[in-house]
Amino acid sequence: MILQANCGTTAMGIMPHSDIEQALELALGLDIPFWPQLPNVSLYEDMYVQTSEHFPGITIDFERGRLVFSTARFQEELEDYYTKMEHPETYALTTEYSRVFKKFLSRDLQGYKAIRGQITGPVSFGFKVLDETFKPIIYNEEAKTILFDFIQKKANVQYQELKAKNQNAFVWVDEPGLGYVFSGLSGYNDQHAKEDYYNFIQGLEGPKGLHLCADVNLPYLLELGIEILSFDAFQIGFMPKEYAGSVSEFLKKGGVISWGIVPTESSILLIQTPEKLASTLSNYWEVISDNTGLALRQIAEQALIAPARCCLRDIGTETTGKCEIPNVEEKIVEKAFSFLQEISQILREKFEL
């Protein structure tokens, strides 16, 4: 097994907090803590901006809060990049681009069963960053080739830094944009992405993790060569029988699944309880077990429990038309984190972990 999961708790990296220490304390309260990404602290803490550090051709537009890619600048900076591409410091996350990461590394992290980092994946980054013609850089073959290698190296440098603090470290690749490849309009289809991604994943050091909070195709994701999958389990509503075989095979090979079962929209979280969510997750697992024969206890042993998504904006308040509550997103995340511990305890007792 990649790690001893046993229904332990973790969460995705992005948090709405503007207080670094408060966010860190919440993250460090989980079984597998992580370093938070806090875009409300600074644009440098944004997941895309952090990943862009030292990528040729990219500048930050602080006024518009976005990254800008210039094809001409890319060509100008390529030669210098090639001279530095084998140097680890080219890929290290500096204090300027994440005060939080350095603060996380300054803590004593040896006592945890594992610790985790994250990095924006090449597909999401490639779709998000546009050139001067507003075309995603994933369609620029030269930029795309460098991008996959660049992010792979950044993930590996981060992994080594985390491993120095805890031997059971891992970095998962955050890929909210991976769902785009199933759109017939994307021009970068699922098969092309699968080939690129498999090679990318194989070059990652340590446990190979992937996080996706968009609509998911579990069999597709589980065939990418990963060892840890984190996904929004709440939004699927039920476990399709057609997915059971793929999930079972993944777990039989020692894989770990982080089930994002706690919703982070206020209107939905309001009507949920830890007991109801634990029951929902148990029902998913029963579908897998009933259709494959895989023991429920094994599924639980190889499960992590997490929020469904990050919460930078409370969609629940927007859709219900309620008045805005100060720091409502922070309160939602804190409530979701408290649910995690209770759900974990319920499942550990149920499956005698």
Q: What label would you give each PLM region?
A:
Residues 1-136, 255, 273, 287-293, ...:
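Alpha/beta catalytic barrel-like cores
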Residues 30-31, 223-230, 251-257:
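Glycine-enriched alpha-helix->loop->beta-strand junction motifs that scaffold or abut catalytic
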Residues 88-105, 141-157, 276-287:
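Glycine-rich anion/phosphate-binding loops
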Residues 114-117, 136-245:
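Active-site loop segments of alpha/beta catalytic cores
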Residues 120-122, 176-178, 213-217, 234-236, ...:
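Active-site beta-loop-alpha junctions enriched in small/polar residues
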Residues 237-263:
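Glycoside hydrolase catalytic-domain groove-lining segments
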Residues 240-247, 273-298:
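A short, acidic, amphipathic alpha-helical segment used as a generic capping/interface helix at domain edges
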Residues 254-278, 307-316:
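Active-site clefts of carbohydrate-active enzymes
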